[in-house]
UniProtKB/Swiss-Prot annotation:
One of its GO terms (cellular component) is respiratory chain complex I. It is found in: Mitochondrion membrane. It catalyses: a ubiquinone + NADH + 5 H(+)(in) = a ubiquinol + NAD(+) + 4 H(+)(out). It comes from Formosania lacustris (Oriental stream loach). Belongs to the complex I subunit 4L family. Keywords: Electron transport, Membrane, Mitochondrion, NAD, Respiratory chain, Translocase, Transmembrane, Transmembrane helix, Transport, Ubiquinone. It comes from the Eukaryota. Its EC number is 7.1.1.2. Core subunit of the mitochondrial membrane respiratory chain NADH dehydrogenase (Complex I) which catalyzes electron transfer from NADH through the respiratory chain, using ubiquinone as an electron acceptor. Part of the enzyme membrane arm which is embedded in the lipid bilayer and involved in proton translocation. InterPro entries: NADH_UbQ_OxRdtase_chain4L/K, NUOK/Mnh_C1-like. Its main location: mitochondrion. One of its GO terms (molecular function) is NADH dehydrogenase (ubiquinone) activity. It is a multi-pass membrane protein. This is NADH-ubiquinone oxidoreductase chain 4L.
Length: 98
């Protein structure tokens, strides 16, 4: 494994561990998801450059579009839950009670 692959793999694993262990606030969960998506985008872009094919070049742009949608919907959900529940702590949020 090259150092480049190791750095992107470790960035994804750190984001996943942050999502699993530090789930106290919704904002920290959204930031961990954003870090995971960024490491996936860079890894997918490098993978597309390695194969030098035009068929693989659309995958990073599609992932970037989905991560932009996630990044724009996240703060809206954060504001909505803070207004309705009074907090953004994930322990107090229950989707069955909404």
């Amino acid at each position: 494994m090259t150092p480049v692959h190791f750095s992107f793999t470790s960035a994804f694993i750190l984001g996943l561990m942050g999502l699993a262990f530090y789930r106290t606030h919704l904002l920290s969960a959204l930031l961990c998801l954003e870090g995971m998506m960024l490491s996936l985008f860079i890894a997918l872009a490098l993978w597309a450059l390695q194969f030098e094919s035009t068929g693989f070049s659309t995958a990073p742009m599609l992932l970037l579009a989905f991560s932009a949608c996630e990044a724009s919907a996240g703060p809206g959900l954060l504001v909505a839950t803070a207004r309705t529940h009074g907090t953004d702590r994930l322990q107090n949020l229950n989707l069955l009670q909404c």
